[in-house]
């Protein structure tokens, strides 16, 4: 029963929050610091459909741009004990197909893209709380603990493995690394949990941006919080909010003030 509940929980998380890992913008992801048994493997898959208005640099003369994006995502997590703490390492990979449309110099245009997105890896360790336990010990601990606080830290690395062509403005990959150190705290009280996570994004340069340009971005600093209510193991609901600052881009040494 424990394994079944954990698998259901894992799949729910992937379906709800697997996709945002692949975005450059801030994601809102609840339960990223949840206590898991060590020595376990988790796998899940999900699908997301996205519609959005997008904006481009005015110099490109692209207006009223929209995108429709289909994403199929798979995720794997392995948990283990690390320096007497509970830890995990995970991998996310997605395949995407989408259509972008808008006005280029006042003329309607559209383009389609399909392929793999950037791979994302995450290593996380709980510094306080959430002891490294297996099987029955883990189940017994979770059954008796009603109030607890967990503090964790993590590093997310987005790899430049996605579909990318330097002669195209729209790509599924980013052609650069992104490093995201994280620090989070969770307070559980009965069926309620309150989470707070601070994170910053460090971008390497894209020296092969569209039309031979060089793209740079300042670090992006983010803060997010979530309130989670657990109805039963494997079924929960969450509400969250986030704030981000920074990430301004520079093209060929010229600040874009975005």
Predicted features by range, described:
Residues 10-20:
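Bacterial N-terminal signal peptides
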Residues 97-216, 258:
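Outer-membrane pore/translocation modules
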